[in-house]
Amino acid sequence: MSYPDDYSTDIEKNKMDLKEFKEKTQIAELESKVLRLELKNKDVTRENVQIKKENEILKRELDKLRIPPLILGTILDKVNERKAVVKSSTGPNFLVNLSQFVDPEDIVPGARVCLNQQTLAIVEVLPKEKDYRAMAMEIEEKPDISFEDIGGLNNQIRDIKEVVELPLKNPELFEKVGIVPPKGVLLYGPPGTGKTLLAKAVAYETNASFVRVVGSELVKKFIGEGAKLVRDVFKLAKEKSPCIIFIDEIDAVASKRTESLTGGDREVQRTLMQLLAEMDGFDSRGDVKIIAATNRPDILDPAILRPGRFDRIIEISMPDEDGRLEILKIHTEKMNLKNVDLREVAKLAENMVGADLKAVCTEAGMFAIREEREFIKMDDFKEAISKITGKKEKCSYDMPQLTVMYG
């Protein structure tokens, strides 16, 4: 059977088109496959680079772990630029060489160094040792109490500003007059009169660093620990200068020295002598101010009270009627009062200190809450004064000592 020529030509053309279409399809599939492989290759390359980086980090960490530990030592004497006498932590003294990576200027007696285990050569100089207990005494966040929050102590605030705040903010005034600024102030008075509050206000008002120490923290069990802590506190203060050191309850460490032979008393006396030396010893104290507080000035050692250590001794006495009124205004500023005469409250609150007046305000608020009121009236304050006065009378067996001490 024969086909027309035109029909045969169409068949051949269709075959050619089909073949060409298959080839194009195969090429497109191959190009798509190549593109996918290229993308996959990029991902693999990226992962390979990341794995190599991690491998290098792990190798470095492994090398660090393989390095043998170094021996700690203390420089006793520098012989020349490349040799020094070292006391190792294992006990004996050695004459050792300096590594080429160590600056000879850093090799001074007392410096802490690292020694190679095999050759005992000095390979590194460590920073000065710091007592973590002294570091913890620095206050990072300053209190939010200013002098405006303290009532009835205007003269005392003026005195403490002249001794502590003025030398730090305007030292040129003392240079013009030609005098050395005072360096210390002792606050004494009955409990609750605002001694610690004044120190908090000083920390708030000045931009100086503030180190707070409680006297009992300086009394340690073993010989030399208390004196070392005192040295470290003053060393920290010098590094952070201008700085204020506040020693609360200083009578715990600065009581009068006696002939007592007990080990505990001797250690307290050693700590006191170190404190005296740091306050006004051979080395200059620099721009470091000291504020101390106590409610037992009668038992303090006379040596610590002399000028040069505490240039100004400020009595924080019981507030008078006007002082009590100022304190009440501060504590009742945010309270919802109704028909309350604060002057009358101040008259009724005779022989009360600032802490007592704050307790009175709190108790008055509690009486209002007890009666489901949103405001405080005069009767609440009267009941609160009676309650606080009753508590103080129950503890009257402690009062004769305070009466004798503060007149």
From Swiss-Prot:
Keyword Chaperone among UniProt keywords: yes
Stretches the record annotates as Docks into pockets in the proteasome alpha-ring to cause gate opening: 405-407
InterPro entries in alphabetical order: 26S_Proteasome_ATPase, AAA+_ATPase, AAA_lid_3, ATPase_AAA_core, ATPase_AAA_CS, NA-bd_OB-fold, Nucleotidase_PAN, P-loop_NTPase
Residues where ATP binds: G192, T193, G194, K195, T196, L197, H331
GO biological process, one term: protein unfolding
Alphabetical list of PROSITE patterns matching this protein: AAA (PS00674)
The keyword Coiled coil belongs to this UniProt entry's keyword annotation: yes
GO cellular component: cytoplasm; proteasome-activating nucleotidase complex
Annotated NCBIfam families: PRK03992.1, proteasome-activating nucleotidase
Protein family (similarity comment): Belongs to the AAA ATPase family.
Subunit relationships: Homohexamer. The hexameric complex has a two-ring architecture resembling a top hat that caps the 20S proteasome core at one or both ends. Upon ATP-binding, the C-terminus of PAN interacts with the alpha-rings of the proteasome core by binding to the intersubunit pockets.
Protein name as it appears in the record: Proteasome-activating nucleotidase
Source species of the chain: Methanococcus maripaludis (strain C7 / ATCC BAA-1331)
Gene: pan
